[in-house]
Every structure is written in structure tokens, then in C-alpha cells.
Amino acid sequence: MDDKANIIETFTELAPRYEEVVNAELNRFWGWSYTGFVNHLIQATPIPEKGKILDLATGTGVIPITVASNGFGVSRVHGLDITMSMLARARKKMISSNIRKEIDLVCASAMDIPYENKTFDLVTCALATHHMEVKTLLSESWRVLNEGGILSIADVGGSNLWKLPVVKFLLRIAAFVYFLFTENINRAWAEAGAVSNVRSKEEWSDLLTETGFQNIKITKLKSKYRWVPEPLVIQATKSNSGGSK
């Protein structure tokens, strides 16, 4: 099974209990609730009035639903996810919240975003970049953003020690064993494979600059334990000149 197929299978199985599981994991390692973490990202993000927003790896639609139902005045919110069952959960939540008209959902990969160049004023992504090829994610985000548009990300951040092959190997083993015992074999493979995609604050800054983003701001949030990698909130603006490398 390739990585993409395993991710889809993993989150298909996880979809009915996704928010409960992620809430428990964030609380266990970072001391955050899932709702609190997402709300922090939204509050830290300049939401463009009458703008178009794209939420990558939208999952059960928490970000689009929160933005659409809290009077931010955006024109449209789009949620993209690679897993149909996650989007099905999002649609059910949209119906119960009576906000179906404000949100569009699409099943697709953030590695190949099915929108034209310069479509959105804001692109968001929470707790998912570690399952993606980061350079491709940034390039695609740049492509679909309007000039002056904002990219806003929240996810786990690594340290420079993670670059060392032996450290990376040990982290993969630790992730595999932990999720094998707490979840299942597919989740174990997915999270072990994600270790290579975790970037440090410095690496994020370099990659954003290489892609052509400006006004880069990366904030480390507090973690429950010192030995646990800290979460990062990452924001950057698409410059009015230049282009994705």
C-alpha cells in the first residue's frame, strides 16, 4: 500500500471518532483541546472580509464551519480533504449548523489543488502538514493565493536534531509503536511515515522564503511537556512580485 492509499484508509477508519481522538491526543501531549487549538489558529489569522478561504485537509470541517458561523463576513469558504468519509462527517455538521450555503467541500489532494491560480485570499491548514510533502504544499498554496493573500498553518514542529538519521529512525519507531498500541496498524504506519515531513521553525522559514512568501511569522505555542515537540503557528503573505520556486 502506498502512502496516499494508507492515509486515505487511516482517516476513513478514523472519521467517525476523529475529533474525540485528536482532542485526547492534543490534551495528552500538548495540554490543548482540539477546539482550543483550532480557535487559536483562527484568532491568530487575519480573516479577510468578503474574501475567499480555502482550508486544506479540512477533515470534519471544523475551520470552515467555525469561520462561516461566527460572523467573519467572508464571501465563501472551501474545504478540501483527500478522504470522502471525513467530508461526509463535515457535511452532516454543516446541515446541523444550517450553514450549507456558505461552504463548498471538495475531495482532492493538497498536493494538486483543483482550483485556478489566484483564487483565494486565505489558505489555512491545521494538524495536517506532517502528512504532506511540504515543498509541494507551499508551492500549491502559493499558486492558488491572490497577491497579498495569506497562508496560515498550525502543526507540530520538529527540532534540528530530527535531521540526524539515527534520531529520525528512533522517532519513527516510537511513533509506530505508540500508535500501534493506541490505534491500529494503518495509523501506526501513517504517523511513523509523517516524521520525515515534520519541520523545525527555521526550516519552515527557509522553505516559505524559497517559495516566495514574505512577512513570515512563526510562533511556538506552549507544550505540556518539554520533551514533546512544540506546536507551531505559521503565517506568511504571498508577495506582489516574484513567484513560487
Stretches with model-predicted labels:
Residues 54-56, 60-112:
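Class I SAM-dependent methyltransferase SAM/SAH-binding core
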Residues 156-211, 216-224:
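C-terminal alpha-helical "lid/dimerization" subdomain adjacent to the S-adenosyl-L-methionine
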Residues 122-135:
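A short SAM/SAH-binding and catalytic strip from SAM-dependent methyltransferases
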Residues 211-214, 220-245:
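Core SAM-dependent methyltransferase catalytic element
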Residues 136-147:
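A short glycine-rich, Lys/Arg-flanked "PGG" loop and its adjoining helix->strand segment in the class I
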Residues 1-47, 66:
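Conserved class I S-adenosyl-L-methionine
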Residues 111-123:
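A short acidic, Gly/Pro-enriched loop at the edge of an enzyme's catalytic core
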Residues 149-156:
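Conserved beta-strand signature within the Rossmann-like core of class I S-adenosyl-L-methionine
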